[in-house]
């Protein structure tokens, strides 16, 4: 009756309830990461069916979490059609490979059975038992035999690298700068005369004591002076410029709705991070912030800019776009200009854009330059745009974090192809989680993602070829510990504060020491410990020597057993087909998306007509297309980049690349090193150029006549006779010194000649 009405009946005591059998877990299991046999069995024993393995605590460790600010940014992302992710493609290829291996194995066993049909029945029984055992252990079977396991469990050896001790030359304080590197070490946030809303936000974020850069910068920033600050990465530079700016905005409320503070950052991810920190510091104030970076929705940004936020955080490209295409937006009311990671902002790739932005800014402004390394470009800008600036050097330009342990792995000559195998061995055996792997090129980063993914590791990638959605998603997953390894290019090397990064691995040494400082600065942040492991070839030894010389703590040399490297090299060679299969899947999907887009455009034109389709006006830029093209060609690092000149050259280059075929492991590594060397070569050429002559004094102090170095004493005949100074007379009376006697072969004088022994005072008998 109840069932007819669609209601659920009550179960009586006598009613029999059918119990569904428990689902078998004997189906195909996903191949886990390469874990050695004993460890994997232990993991299997500890698994309990009472808890869902996907369960995650919602509350994270730490005093505050900026996820609410990130969620707001994620909502502005451009919506795109959902496609299969790279991880899904890798998983598909892995499953296919696994089934093929199983089929091959079963075929092999059948052949063995047929071969042994004529053998004794006892042997047949043993074979059957072995087959049953093999089928049971199939799910938990690792890729390695017990012999392989013995090889892979060999420990790496660590040696301390010796360095030649040299006295460091002290930095001279410039005459143009007012030096404020000395600060009160006992200064706290309460002593800085900050407003109550800011102190409340500082407490809410869990900040207890200011860092050295904050102690030095905040009091100077509150005075409204221009600042040129240099401090190591991970020392809290964001709060050092955000707090004085927020205090200024609270103290002096705006009279009209205008944007008063502009913060320029080099990368989108750093912009999102600075925006998140600024919003958290301003959560108890009536101060509005806006984020204008590439990859986010332009229309929503334009609407936010029309509302005239107090603080604008932007990347140079998107800011210029808004300045030329958003009529109501301008920079004439800017009171404070902040350049975060100023050395990157002022390199050759941002040069034209920065000139345009500074030209459009208000002349009456406070300017703050913050960087981990001080370059000539930063000094040039400081001399032109800063008025009586205060220079704050908390750390030396090439100082790494104090609790960073630096390790280096030597790559032998003609062994450049071992880099991938070494990285795979490190990530599988030693550093399994919270790792950032830096590569020189986007192509190599993508390849490493595929390779490590095929090995069963949880990997993500972050570089310029990805869409903004993919970049932020990779960053979010790494922060939330959904992935263990983040493969990135130098786009992630600056300013990003990812909590809990334990290890940074450099696939090749970066372009310059400055880039190295930024890369390894992703770990050992805010007083925590961390480790960096860099692979160094013969061509990169010079940079290694400079790093060892500058290091304060002892530097270690890590040596991996050769057997381990060979095993991983063989494994990677076997995986080449799978890597190619994943790349093919990606290419097919890309072609499908392009075809779909063309079909949709054609449909829209057929349905509405060409005139009915409203096309948005083209967005203007401060350079013409030709000027942009020339600039791109001028800054191309390599000959093949010059293919940008025209279609014919581009086609020819593509054809030549196809003829050559796939690069070997050695060629890939050499290509990475070549890129870094070409950048360093160009940088060296630029540094050799003569400096611009200026009417006003530059930031460098006007040095007096060079002090003559003290030369060794030279014996001159006429000087010795005519010199009547007190010192000369004293030397003349004393006679030749011990060293001079030694050189001349004279008998040595007894030391302490004036001393009278007791024997002289003995009474004569």
From Swiss-Prot:
Keyword Protease annotated: no
Composition bias, Basic and acidic residues: 129-156
Place the motif DEAD box on the sequence.
340-343
Residues bound to ATP are 231-238
Q: Where is this motif: Required for interaction with the PEBOW complex?
A: 55-57
Sorted alphabetically, which Gene3D superfamilies does this protein's record hold? P-loop containing nucleotide triphosphate hydrolases
What chemistry does it catalyse, as a reaction equation?
ATP + H2O = ADP + phosphate + H(+)
At what positions is Phosphoserine found?
23, 25, 48, 135, 146
One Pfam match, given by its short name, reads DEAD
An example of a Gene Ontology cellular component annotation for this protein is: nucleolus
Residue ranges, compositional bias (Acidic residues): 43-63, 157-172
Helicase ATP-binding domain mapped to chain residues:
218-392
What biological-process GO terms show up in the record?
rRNA processing
Q: Which SMART domains match?
A: DEXDc, HELICc
Q: What is its EC number?
A: 3.6.4.13
InterPro entries associated with the record: DEAD/DEAH_box_helicase_dom (IPR011545), DEAD_box_RNA_helicase (IPR050079), Helicase_ATP-bd (IPR014001), Helicase_C-like (IPR001650), P-loop_NTPase (IPR027417), RNA-helicase_DEAD-box_CS (IPR000629), RNA_helicase_DEAD_Q_motif (IPR014014)
Purpose of the protein: Probable ATP-dependent RNA helicase. Component of the nucleolar ribosomal RNA (rRNA) processing machinery that regulates 3' end formation of ribosomal 47S rRNA.
On subunit structure and binding partners, the annotation says: Associates with PeBoW complex, composed of BOP1, PES1 and WDR12. Interacts directly with BOP1 and PES1.
What's the protein called, per UniProt?
Probable ATP-dependent RNA helicase DDX27
Species: Homo sapiens (Human)
What gene is this protein a product of? DDX27
């Amino acid at each position: 009756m109840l069932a007819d009405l669609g209601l659920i009946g009550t179960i009586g005591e006598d009613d029999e309830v059918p119990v569904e059998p428990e689902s078998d877990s004997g189906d195909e299991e996903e191949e886990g990461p390469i874990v050695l046999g004993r460890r994997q069995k232990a993991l299997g024993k500890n698994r309990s069916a009472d808890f869902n393995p996907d369960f995650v605590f919602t509350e994270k460790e730490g005093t505050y979490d900026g996820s609410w600010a990130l969620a707001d940014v994620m909502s502005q992302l451009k919506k795109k059609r959902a496609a299969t992710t790279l991880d899904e493609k890798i998983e598909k290829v892995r499953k296919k490979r696994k089934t093929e291996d199983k089929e091959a194995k079963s075929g092999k066993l059948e052949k063995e059975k047929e071969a042994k049909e004529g053998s004794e029945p006892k042997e047949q029984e043993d074979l059957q038992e072995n087959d049953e055992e093999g089928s049971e252990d199939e799910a938990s079977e690792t890729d390695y035999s017990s012999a392989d396991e013995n090889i892979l469990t060999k420990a790496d050896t660590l040696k301390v690298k010796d360095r030649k001790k040299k006295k460091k030359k002290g930095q001279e304080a410039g005459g143009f700068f007012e030096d404020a590197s000395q600060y009160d070490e006992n200064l706290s946030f309460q002593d800085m005369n900050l407003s109550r809303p800011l102190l409340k936000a500082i407490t809410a974020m869990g900040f207890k004591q200011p860092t050295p850069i904050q102690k030095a910068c905040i009091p100077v920033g509150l005075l409204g002076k221009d600042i040129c600050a240099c401090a190591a990465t991970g020392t809290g530079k964001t709060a050092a410029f955000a707090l004085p700016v927020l205090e200024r905005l609270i103290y002096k409320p705006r009279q009209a709705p205008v944007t008063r503070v502009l913060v320029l950052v080099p990368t989108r991810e750093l912009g999102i991070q600075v925006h998140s920190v600024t919003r958290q510091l301003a959560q108890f104030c009536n101060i509005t912030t806006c984020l204008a970076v590439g990859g986010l929705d332009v229309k929503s940004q334009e609407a936010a800019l029309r509302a005239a936020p107090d603080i604008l955080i932007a990347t140079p490209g998107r800011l210029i776009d808004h300045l030329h295409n958003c009529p109501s937006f301008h920079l004439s009311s800017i009171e404070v200009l902040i350049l975060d990671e100023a050395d990157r902002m002022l390199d050759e790739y941002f040069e034209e854009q920065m000139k345009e932005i500074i030209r459009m800014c208000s002349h009456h402004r406070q300017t703050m330059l913050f960087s981990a390394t001080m370059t000539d470009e930063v000094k040039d800008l400081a001399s032109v745009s800063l008025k009586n600036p205060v220079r704050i050097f908390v750390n030396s330009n090439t100082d790494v974090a104090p609790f960073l342990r630096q390790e280096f792995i030597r790559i032998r000559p003609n062994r450049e192809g071992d880099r991938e195998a070494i990285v795979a061995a490190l990530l599988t055996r030693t550093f399994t989680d919270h790792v950032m792997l830096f590569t020189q090129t986007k192509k190599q980063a993508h390849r490493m993602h595929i390779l490590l993914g095929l090995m069963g590791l949880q990997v993500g990638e972050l570089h310029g070829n990805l869409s903004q959605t993919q970049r932020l998603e990779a960053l979010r997953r790494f922060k939330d510990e959904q992935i263990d390894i983040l493969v990135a290019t130098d786009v992630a090397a600056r300013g990003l504060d990812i909590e809990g990064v334990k290890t940074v691995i450099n696939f090749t040494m970066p372009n310059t020491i400055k880039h190295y400082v930024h890369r390894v600065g992703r770990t050992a942040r805010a007083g925590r410990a961390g480790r960096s492991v860099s692979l160094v070839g013969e061509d990169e030894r010079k940079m290694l020597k400079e790093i060892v010389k500058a290091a304060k703590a002892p530097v270690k040399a890590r040596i991996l057993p050769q057997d381990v490297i060979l095993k991983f090299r063989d494994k990677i060679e076997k995986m080449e087909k799978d890597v190619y299969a994943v790349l093919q899947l990606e290419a097919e999907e890309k072609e499908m998306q392009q075809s779909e887009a063309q079909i949709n455009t054609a449909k829209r034109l057929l349905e509405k007509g060409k005139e009915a389709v409203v096309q948005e006006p083209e967005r203007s830029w401060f350079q013409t297309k030709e000027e942009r093209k020339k600039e791109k060609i001028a800054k191309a690092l390599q000959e093949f980049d010059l293919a940008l000149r025209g279609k014919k050259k581009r086609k020819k280059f593509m054809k030549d690349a196809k003829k050559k075929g796939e690069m070997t492991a050695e060629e890939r590594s050499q290509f990475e090193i070549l890129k870094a060397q070409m950048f360093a070569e160009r940088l060296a050429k630029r540094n050799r150029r003569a400096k611009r002559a200026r009417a006003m004094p530059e930031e460098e102090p006007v040095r007096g006549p060079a002090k003559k170095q003290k030369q060794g004493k030279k014996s001159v005949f006429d000087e010795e006779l005519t010199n009547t100074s007190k010192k000369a007379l004293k030397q003349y009376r004393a006679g030749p010194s011990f060293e001079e006697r030694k050189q001349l072969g004279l008998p040595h004088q007894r030391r302490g000649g004036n001393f009278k022994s007791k024997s002289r005072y003995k009474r004569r008998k």
